């Protein structure tokens, strides 16, 4: 202790002419996959970078890395594993197909229900069976932008509010310059593995479930968790939101938005105290993490989507390193990501489980925080991807 201290069926449908279309424009690229530009439409199926097994194709026409020009809180980030990407389409990528994804009905203005805050279980909208597991103080529904920087970097992505989930006290995130470090009673605690269905082990040394669908159900389809998990010694202060749902008719994917921050930076950056966020999907097409960076790392302290760094570190920001975007939050002097958007493909009519989990790694101090918002069923399927929102 530091002194701080997943119906397995396959559906085949043939159409004459026939993938989902959205209101945003999308142009087929050389691999035949429709790819909307990043930031155009936040419905499922936006472009980005996914993780897979062997030689691969990119899922974006823009190979740049977030922050590579040094303009956002400390410049580019070095990742800890080799870049591996892929692009997989399903029925949602067949031109002319009509999408049946339900509309979004925000309803978070009248209460602090965490499911309403992320865009679920609203009247007339998507309904799920949800659980909230962890210390009560690990969950906080926030209204409006987080922090004081202008233009606001962290406004709600749908409705008026978003969910803050923490490995400590989530509401601490609203206190400027606070050193957020609370050891709470986690849903799981004491250096153990995350609860089922999450499995930290990779499905294969060489393949993901995208390259070998027979691996579904044998571990983490993305192969993104184990390497970083093995750097530490188990989960502490674990908190999660999880839901089960039947995928709506003629719906082939979903998306949600997230951002992650950690007090572990800078002192424990690139060490075994690699606090993590995992977005785990349990489905017919995928069992594993769906939120990861372009280099194959989960969303963690040591991952390459760490856009805002408000202190120097000897690895990738040895000089002046500032992130005014974090002003007015507990992460002043620490680090976080931009809003990110994760998308993943699913099968219409199947039952899925989705888990949003955050936890400390190796000990229970120095908090890590995740924002969650804007869950939407969408038109396009394919492999999981995460992009800057």
What spans do the regions from the language model cover?
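Sec-dependent bacterial lipoprotein signal peptides
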Residues: 1-18
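Glycine-centered secondary-structure boundary/capping sites
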Residues: 3-4, 23-27, 302-304, 375
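Ser/Thr-rich, Pro/Gly/Ala-heavy low-complexity intrinsically disordered linkers and tails
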Residues: 19-95
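Aromatic (Trp/Tyr/Phe) and Gly/Pro-enriched flexible surface segments
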Residues: 83-389
């Amino acid at each position: 202790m530091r002194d701080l201290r997943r119906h397995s069926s396959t559906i085949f449908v043939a159409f004459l002419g026939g993938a989902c279309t959205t209101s945003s424009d999308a142009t087929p690229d050389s691999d035949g996959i429709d790819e909307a530009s990043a930031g155009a439409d936040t419905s499922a199926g936006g472009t980005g970078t996914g993780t897979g097994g062997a030689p691969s194709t990119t899922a974006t026409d823009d190979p740049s890395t977030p922050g590579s020009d040094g303009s956002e809180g400390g410049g580019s980030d070095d990742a800890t594993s080799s870049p591996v990407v892929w692009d997989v389409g399903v029925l949602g990528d067949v031109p002319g197909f009509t999408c049946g994804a339900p509309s979004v009905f925000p309803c978070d203005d009248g209460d602090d229900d965490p499911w309403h805050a992320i865009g679920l279980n609203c009247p007339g909208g998507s309904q799920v069976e949800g659980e909230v597991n962890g210390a009560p103080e690990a969950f906080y529904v926030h209204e409006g932008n987080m922090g004081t920087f202008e233009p606001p970097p962290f406004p709600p992505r749908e409705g008026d509010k978003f969910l803050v989930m923490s490995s400590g006290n989530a509401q601490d995130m609203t206190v400027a310059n606070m050193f957020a470090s609370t050891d709470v009673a986690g849903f799981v605690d004491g250096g153990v593995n995350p609860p089922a269905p999450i499995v930290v082990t990779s499905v294969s040394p060489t393949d993901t479930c995208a390259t070998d669908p027979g691996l579904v159900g044998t571990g983490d389809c993305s192969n993104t968790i184990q390497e970083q998990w093995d750097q530490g010694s188990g989960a502490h202060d674990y908190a999660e939101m999880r839901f089960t749902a039947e995928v709506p008719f003629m719906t082939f994917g979903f998306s949600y938005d997230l951002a992650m921050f950690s007090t572990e930076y800078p002192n424990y950056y690139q060490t075994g105290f690699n606090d993590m966020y995992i977005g785990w999907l349990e489905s017919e097409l995928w069992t594993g993490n769906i939120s990861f960076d372009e280099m194959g790392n989960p969303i963690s302290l040591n991952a390459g989507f760490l856009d805002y760094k408000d202190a120097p570190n000897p690895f990738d920001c040895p000089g002046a390193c500032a992130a005014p975007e974090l002003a007015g939050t507990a992460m002043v002097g620490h680090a976080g990501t931009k809003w990110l958007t994760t998308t993943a493909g699913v099968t219409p009519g199947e039952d899925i489980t989705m888990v949003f989990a955050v936890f400390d790694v190796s000990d229970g101090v120095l908090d890590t925080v995740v924002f969650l918002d804007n869950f939407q069923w969408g038109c396009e399927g394919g492999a999981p991807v995460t992009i800057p929102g």
